[in-house]
Amino acid sequence: MKAWQFTKTHKPLELIDYPEPKAGKGEVVVDIKASGLCHTDVTILDDPGWMQLIKAPVILGHEYAGVIDSVGEEVTDFKVGDRVGICPIDPDTGTSIGGMVDGAYANKMVVPATEAIHLPDNVTFLQGAAATDAGMTSHHA
């Protein structure tokens, strides 16, 4: 599979071959249908000060939505084919997707099932991707 990798400020993202993700215990693999580019991503690309806040190389992208591709053991809230949005920060660890761990500028990614939320059928993947970050921001304001 392919993914866009960030390596250094003021360098373009690099399209790389990336291992196909596999769901472990408590995890889901998401087939990404939409992924946003937000101010954080642009700042990471342009501001060297952000290098201390992320692990590079890293796959950027923390605003995304998609379809469950596979589920790991002990996942009961989701099944293959479910439409989901993903919380950009792990509520249990505070780890940020697309900064501290690889993000959604890829075909698929694996995340803890606790980070996924069901996306209603009347919400597009584009709307769902934008809402994951903006919704979290307004929720915590």
Model-derived features with residue positions:
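Cytochrome P450 core scaffold surrounding the K-helix E-X-X-R motif
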Residues: 40-46
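Short N-terminal binding/cap micro-motifs at the start of the first secondary-structure element
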Residues: 10-15, 39-40
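Histidine-centered active-site/metal-ligand motif
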Residues: 39, 62, 140
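Extreme N-terminal starter segment of soluble prokaryotic enzymes
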Residues: 1-2
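A short, acidic/glycine-rich surface segment
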Residues: 14-15, 51-54, 92-98
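Conserved hydrophobic/aromatic beta-strand scaffold that supports enzyme active sites
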Residues: 5, 15-17, 65-67, 108-110, ...
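NAD(P)H dinucleotide-binding glycine-rich loop of Rossmann-like/cofactor-binding domains
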Residues: 87-141
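Glycine-rich beta-strand-centered segment in the early N-terminal region that forms part
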Residues: 19-35, 48-90, 120-123
